[in-house]
C-alpha cells in the first residue's frame, strides 16, 4: 500500500463527524513534526485546528484543508461501512475519501517529499487544518484567520484541497467563490378562522408580493468570471397544521450567493428597503457566511494552469462556481487563493469515493505546485 493510500485509509477510519476531529490532527501533527514542521494546536470551543509551518519569511504558501466530514446518513444504505475504507475495482470508498481526507493525506505526503528534496527552501510552507468546515464554520478557519491577522502573519498564496475537479483530476481550477448571505424573516400577522378573514391578518398573503419582488429581481449581470447574483428561498413555515386556521406568523429562510459586485451590508440594505415598501410587520436576522473572493491573473494562476494541464492533458477550466469554502476566510488576509482537488461527483453522498489513480497522483500534483511556487521563487 502506498504512503498516500495508507494515510488516507487511516484518516477515513476515524469517524470525524463535524466538529469532532477524532484524533486526525494529532496523528498528522506528529508526522509533520518528524518532517521538521513546527505545529500549533488551536482549539476553540469544540473545534480542533492545526497550524503547521516550515521555513520562515515570505513568500508564504498555505495548504488549507479540513479533517471533519458530514454524517454518513443511514449506514445500511452504504455498500460498505463508511468508516471502514474499502477498495473495489480501483476505487477507494469511505466517508471523506473525496471530501477531503484524500487531499489532506496528499498534502502531508507532498510536504514530506518537498522537504526531503528542499530542506532549506525559500519562504514558508504552512498547513492549516480544521474540524469545522462542514459545520458552522465559526470556530475553525474563521477564528484561526482572526488569530493570524492579530499576529501580523502574512499569506501570499493559499491552495485549498477541496474536491474541485469535475470529470477527471485537474480539469477545473477554482479561482474564486461567490459570497454567501443567509436570512431568516419573521412576518407577524393575526391568527384567526379561515371563514372570518376580516378578523385576521394572514402573514402569508401579506408577504407574497414581497417574495415575488425579491425572487423576480435581477440583481446584476455577473462580474468578470462570476455568474449573476442569485436569491433562493429555502424554507417556509407557517400555520398550526389545521386547514381552517389563518396563521399568526410566518417564517421564511432565504440565501443569496453573490459576486464581487456586492458586499453583504449593501445587499442587506437593498432587501430591507424592498420589504419596507410592502408595509410588513417583520423582523429579519442575517448570517454572513463570507464575502466573495477572486484571484486575478498572475503567478499563482499561471503555475496552477501549467501543472493541471500536465496532469489532466488539457488546460483546466477556470471557475468561480460552486458553494463556499474556507478559502473565504484566508483571502481577506491578502492571500491569492485557488482550489485544486479530486473529482467531486460523490461528495456528501452514500458510497463516497475517489479513484485510486487520482489519489496516487495528488501528492505529485501538490508537490509540483509547491516546488514551482517556493523552490523556484
Curated annotation (Swiss-Prot):
Gene3D superfamilies: Zn peptidases. Pfam families: M20_dimer (PF07687), Peptidase_M20 (PF01546). It is an enzyme of class 3 (hydrolase). Keywords: Amino-acid biosynthesis, Cobalt, Diaminopimelate biosynthesis, Hydrolase, Lysine biosynthesis, Metal-binding, Zinc. GO terms for biological process: diaminopimelate biosynthetic process; L-arginine biosynthetic process; lysine biosynthetic process via diaminopimelate. Its EC number is 3.5.1.18. It catalyses: N-succinyl-(2S,6S)-2,6-diaminopimelate + H2O = (2S,6S)-2,6-diaminopimelate + succinate. The active site is at 68, 133 (proton acceptor). It comes from the Bacteria. Catalyzes the hydrolysis of N-succinyl-L,L-diaminopimelic acid (SDAP), forming succinate and LL-2,6-diaminopimelate (DAP), an intermediate involved in the bacterial biosynthesis of lysine and meso-diaminopimelic acid, an essential component of bacterial cell walls. Belongs to the peptidase M20A family. DapE subfamily. This is Succinyl-diaminopimelate desuccinylase. The lineage of its organism: Bacteria, Pseudomonadati, Pseudomonadota, Gammaproteobacteria, Lysobacterales.
